[in-house]
């Protein structure tokens, strides 16, 4: 019973310490050509937040094979971080205001049509801040 109570009260403790987290997710994009960048819709906090980002977790799902050379970045208004896989965490946004929206940016280098097209099914971020 004590463990359950502790789990229920944990979010209140975190907020009292001035820390928190927000998450957002969205539909992905379709990229038909190499050498062209495509950006997701902005992902942002649904409630007012203050403070700076500490740790950001990301996840995206592709609908089909990963094209050779795929470059994926997660960008705030002030900086971008290269992502090394379909999910992970980064401290690359440390000290960026937690209120800034994030966007995924996809690009496959080269030229010509992508066959099959790159289809991003979904993308998600969880932003921890203090």
UniProtKB/Swiss-Prot annotation:
Pfam families: FlhE. Keywords: Bacterial flagellum biogenesis, Signal. It comes from the Bacteria. Residues 1-16 form the signal peptide. GO terms for biological process: bacterial-type flagellum organization. InterPro entries: FlhE (IPR009420). The keyword 4Fe-4S does not apply. The keyword Isomerase does not apply. Not essential for flagellar formation and function. This is Flagellar protein FlhE. It comes from Salmonella typhimurium (strain LT2 / SGSC1412 / ATCC 700720). The gene is flhE.
């Amino acid at each position: 019973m004590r463990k359950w109570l502790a789990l229920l009260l944990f979010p209140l403790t975190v907020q009292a310490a001035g820390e928190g987290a927000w998450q957002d997710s969205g539909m992905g994009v379709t990229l038909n050509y190499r050498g062209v960048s495509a950006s997701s819709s902005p992902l942002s906090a649904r409630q007012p937040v203050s403070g700076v980002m500490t740790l950001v977790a990301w996840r995206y799902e592709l609908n089909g094979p990963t094209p050779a050379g795929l470059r994926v970045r997660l960008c705030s208004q002030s900086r971008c971080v290269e992502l090394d896989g379909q999910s992970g965490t980064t401290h690359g946004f440390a000290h960026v205001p937690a209120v800034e929206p994030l966007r995924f940016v996809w690009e496959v280098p080269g030229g010509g049509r992508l066959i099959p097209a790159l289809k991003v099914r979904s993308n998600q971020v969880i932003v921890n801040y203090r």
